[in-house]
């Protein structure tokens, strides 16, 4: 067979088979079994960088910061003051709180605080905070509280007799005979009221019939209610007496069976 007649595909397959046989022979001969590390070369070893010396401790012990807390740097008097997140100094909140009530017993202690004219809270000693206020100590006329304005001692406010509205005068209050009520200051006296005219005596009309009785009128123009006559008063008394006798008989009739047993 001539070489010119062999195709390209045949040459490609023959090349692959030849290389495969070569690799198999080398593997059987021990190819790759004697892989070893090269000896160390001192010239190739790089020098490690030197670490800098440790710096001294900058923060220092925690005890040093106690002086900063005792003498704050941003305070004008270098004294500690309460810190407010709202941005105010708390004087407005502290000035509006007033102690208006104290309740002291052997087992219960409570104080009433007035925050504004329309709002008040009740805080109990040893209890939870109410609207940011907590009761720390309570005395008969003072209380120590902790709130947005810090810790403060409030004195119990009592009425000193000044200000407020005067008591309402009662119209039907009896007065001593001959007593004259005092006039308010800077008020002119009321003009004298003319005496009412005497009541006219009803005249007997011809025929023996009395004229109709006209109820007397008061000075203010209102008519007075007619008074009951003697016959009406007598009839009312008789009804009351009859009712009393009836109740007495019923009471005696109900107690008689119990007495006979």
From Swiss-Prot:
Residues 201-211 have a biased composition (Low complexity). Residues 158-261 are annotated as: Disordered. The keyword Glycosyltransferase does not apply. GO terms for cellular component: plasma membrane. It is a single-pass type II membrane protein. Residues 1-10 are cytoplasmic. Keywords: Cell inner membrane, Cell membrane, Membrane, Transmembrane, Transmembrane helix, Transport. Its main location: membrane. The chain crosses the membrane at residues 11-31. Residues 227-244 have a biased composition (Basic and acidic residues). Residues 179-200 have a biased composition (Pro residues). It is found in: Cell inner membrane. Residues 32-261 are periplasmic. Binds to XpsD. Involved in a general secretion pathway (GSP) for the export of proteins. This is General secretion pathway protein N. It comes from Xanthomonas campestris pv. campestris (strain ATCC 33913 / DSM 3586 / NCPPB 528 / LMG 568 / P 25). The gene is xpsN.
